[in-house]
Amino acid sequence: MNLPITHNAAASRFETIVDGHLCVADYQLDDGVMTMTHTLVPPALEGRGIAAALVAAALAHARASGLRVRPACNYAARSMQRHRETLDLLVA
């Protein structure tokens, strides 16, 4: 899905607006580790690949920034398992 996703560093999240609804992937950054804490997509928008796009944007940012990732969010953890090319980002 091709969405305009914004990195809102001040709010520690990646976000997009779809059909007037804010969708987010929240994270916490500490000592070079991006802990992905939560994804939120309203139920009416589920199944459209929005959460996947948000997580992909967060992981791309982590890679480009030299960050490691801790997927505390179940969705982010499952996404990383499905996209094994991202597993090298995991915190040891």
Language-model segments: residues:
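Conserved acetyl-CoA pyrophosphate-binding loop and the N-cap/start of the following alpha-helix
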Residues: 45, 49-54
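C-terminal structural segments of small proteins and small subunits
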Residues: 57-92
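N-terminal first-folded block
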Residues: 1-39
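Intrinsically disordered, low-complexity sequence elements enriched in Ser/Thr/Gly/Pro
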Residues: 11, 46, 66-68
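Residue-level recognition of the GNAT/N-acetyltransferase active site
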Residues: 42
